[in-house]
């Protein structure tokens, strides 16, 4: 979208991030000067990714097609001094086009149709992925620690948290009791090509906590709470709106209860695994209302109201034998209601990737191609998986998607096409994820708790999406998104 409105350029935050990361690493010994020499742990992760995509617009707009390759280098350093430790991971990406080399940074969010290029990704960039210091001396429990800095917040389902973000996070993990509490806010992407935050991340603070217990061997039950304080500003009536402007603000609180039976443990020996979660979303939300004038979005006001919404996710997996597994899943996020009060949304920190198929490979819960958010969405899932020792695994997943309210929009997704009112059928998808693992044991033992993959692998992950009636006539009959990843950790 073109506009004559001038915008003051913002300086890149990447140099600040690198300076802060170096300060954290160099400052850690001062916290534990009497604890002895730090081990010298450093390395390099090499990732080569090929992406094929056609096309996310379903033929309703030009472009949206990719067939490109890139390399992603991630140098890291880790030091430990008694109860203190520090970690840094950088990133250097070069590609033939703006492809996705990182599952935590979706390439579906860009700065197109914006008044400036502050969020338009480049095909090559430098970044600081993680930089933190950690203290594990608050208690005598080995699974307790306090971490400060840009870090990966993650829980098993990937539906509450799975992202790199600036946070102060306390963790307490034992066999029978797990607990976490923290506060987080995104201040920068720490990339040389992105000077702007995504609009949903601007001026947004997260406060969260959870506690769970193992009430029987391999069976856990727990509760979660997450509060998001979104204090940003919406455009005034008459002002032009672009993709970098916020579309909603408010105070939202998620309250959830969950029960699992080795649901995300690919080594589980139980005959049946399960997961069940229910989440209530409450609070207040102001949604921006707009109209289109001469191909420009113009703010007309805001729609204010309370929020009373819910989401559920259920699943059952049968371990047929040591190699073969099969399962079903169902998820629903409410939608619609007066002034959108029943419109569920996720926390904004989710990836929706997990080991729900029972393999080491993490698969998107709502489709590798569709990549839906649990918002005005229901999804039925069938899957089968296979793994051979620690060397191979494969997952075949089928999804069927519907809207809950056929006159309301869904949340974010990997499809850039408008939905038609009055139609619920979003579509269906078939996913395939296949991985070959090799060269185990290259990483230092001290790093084993910070990585969740073997030292090297080759992986194919792809999805074929067939749109339903909700996308209307005249759209493409199919859309695909596929990746081939080669990863080697030195």
UniProtKB/Swiss-Prot annotation:
InterPro entries per UniProt: Alginate_export_dom, Alginate_Permeability_Chnl
GO biological process: alginic acid biosynthetic process
Coiled coil: none
UniProt membrane topology term: Peripheral membrane protein
Signal peptide boundaries: 1-32
Pfam families: Alginate_exp (PF13372)
Swiss-Prot/TrEMBL keywords: Alginate biosynthesis, Cell outer membrane, Membrane, Signal
The protein's role, per its UniProt record: Has non-porin-like, channel-forming properties and probably functions as an alginate permeability pore.
Protein name per UniProt: Alginate production protein AlgE
């Amino acid at each position: 979208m073109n506009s004559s409105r001038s915008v003051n350029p913002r300086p890149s935050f990447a140099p600040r991030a690198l300076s802060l990361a170096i300060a954290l690493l160099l400052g850690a010994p001062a916290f534990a000067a009497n604890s002895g020499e730090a081990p010298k742990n450093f390395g390099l992760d090499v990732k080569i990714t090929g992406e094929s995509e056609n096309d996310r617009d379903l033929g309703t707009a030009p472009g949206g097609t990719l067939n490109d390759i890139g390399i992603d280098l991630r140098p890291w350093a880790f030091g430990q001094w008694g109860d203190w430790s520090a970690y840094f991971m950088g990133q250097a990406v070069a590609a033939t086009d703006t492809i996705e080399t990182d599952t935590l940074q979706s390439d579906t969010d860009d700065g197109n149709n914006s008044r400036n290029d502050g969020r338009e990704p480049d095909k090559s960039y430098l970044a600081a992925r993680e930089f933190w210091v950690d203290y594990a001396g608050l208690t005598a429990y080995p699974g307790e620690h306090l971490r400060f800095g840009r870090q990966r917040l993650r829980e098993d389902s990937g539906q509450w948290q799975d992202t790199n973000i600036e946070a102060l996070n306390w963790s307490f993990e034992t066999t029978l009791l797990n607990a976490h509490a923290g506060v987080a806010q995104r201040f920068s992407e720490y990339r040389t090509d992105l000077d702007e935050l995504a609009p949903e991340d601007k001026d947004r603070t997260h406060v969260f906590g959870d506690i769970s217990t193992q009430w029987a061997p391999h069976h856990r039950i727990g509760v979660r709470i997450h509060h998001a304080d979104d204090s940003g500003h919406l455009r005034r009536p008459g002002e032009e709106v672009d993709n970098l402007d916020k579309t909603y603000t408010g105070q939202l609180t998620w309250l959830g209860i969950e029960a699992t039976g080795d649901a995300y443990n690919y080594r589980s020996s139980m005959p049946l695994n399960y997961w069940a979660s229910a989440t209530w979303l409450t609070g207040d939300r102001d949604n921006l209302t707009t109209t289109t004038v001469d191909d420009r979005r113009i703010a007309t006001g805001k729609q204010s109201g309370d929020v009373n919404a819910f989401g559920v996710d259920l699943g059952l997996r049968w371990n047929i034998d040591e190699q073969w597994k099969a399962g079903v899943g169902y998820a629903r996020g409410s939608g619609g209601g007066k002034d959108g009060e029943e419109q569920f949304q996720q926390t904004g920190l989710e990836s929706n990737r997990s080991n729900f198929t029972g393999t080491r490979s993490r698969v998107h819960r709502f489709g590798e191609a569709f990549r839906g958010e649990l918002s005005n969405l229901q999804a039925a899932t069938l899957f089968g998986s296979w793994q051979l020792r620690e060397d191979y695994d494969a997952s075949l997943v089928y999804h069927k998607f519907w809207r809950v309210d056929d006159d309301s929009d869904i949340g974010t997704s990997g499809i850039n096409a408008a939905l038609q009112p009055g139609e619920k059928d979003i579509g269906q998808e078939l996913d395939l994820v296949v991985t070959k693992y090799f060269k185990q044991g290259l990483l230092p033992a001290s790093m084993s708790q910070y990585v969740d993959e073997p030292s090297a692998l080759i992986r194919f992950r792809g999805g074929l999406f067939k749109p339903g009636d909700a996308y209307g006539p005249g759209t493409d009959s199919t859309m695909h998104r596929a990746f081939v990843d080669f990863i080697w950790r030195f």
